[in-house]
Amino acid sequence: WVNLLRHRLKDHNKNNSWNVVNASISGDTTAGGLARLANLLNKYKPVLCMIALGANNGLRGQSLKLMRDELNEMVRQCNSIGSSLLIGIKLPPNYGEKYTQAFHNIYSDVAKQHHIPLVPFLLDGIALQDKFFQQDRLHPTAEAQPIILDNVWPVLEETLSNLSK
C-alpha cells in the first residue's frame, strides 16, 4: 500500500512535495523500530512519521507494557522533529479476549496521550476474508493493498491538510 500511497499523493496534489520513505522491515517489532528510529529521523528529517508497528509484538505474545512504552517513545521522537500518525492493528481472537483487547487499546491510548491521529485498524474490511491474505493468513496480498490504502487515506489526508496550513 505504501507504493500506492506515493501515486495517490501525486494524483491528489500535483504540486505536492511529499516524499514517502518506507522504512518498514518485515517481521519487525516495536523494539526494532525504536532501535532504528533515531538514525532514520536524522537521515530523512520527516515532517510526518506514520508508525505501523506492534503486530509482531502481539503475535509473539510479548509484553504489552513494553510495546506501549516503545510506541510512546517513537511518537515522542517523531513529534520532536515533526508530527506522527499511528496505525493500529488487531490480533486474531485465539490470543484470548483479555490480551487482544488490551493489545488493541494500546493504539488509541497512545494516540490520545500524544494528541495524534489514529487509523484504528489497518486491515479493516479485509481481516476476515481469506482471499486478501497469503497462505500464512498474516500477510495481505497485492489485491488487498488498495483497500489498506483506503483505510489509511482519510486520516492521512486530513493530517496532511492540517500540516499544510
Regions found by a protein language model. Name each.
Residues 14-29:
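A short beta-strand-loop structural module common to alpha/beta enzyme folds
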Residues 4-16, 32-165:
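Alpha-helical cap/lid subdomain in secreted, periplasmic
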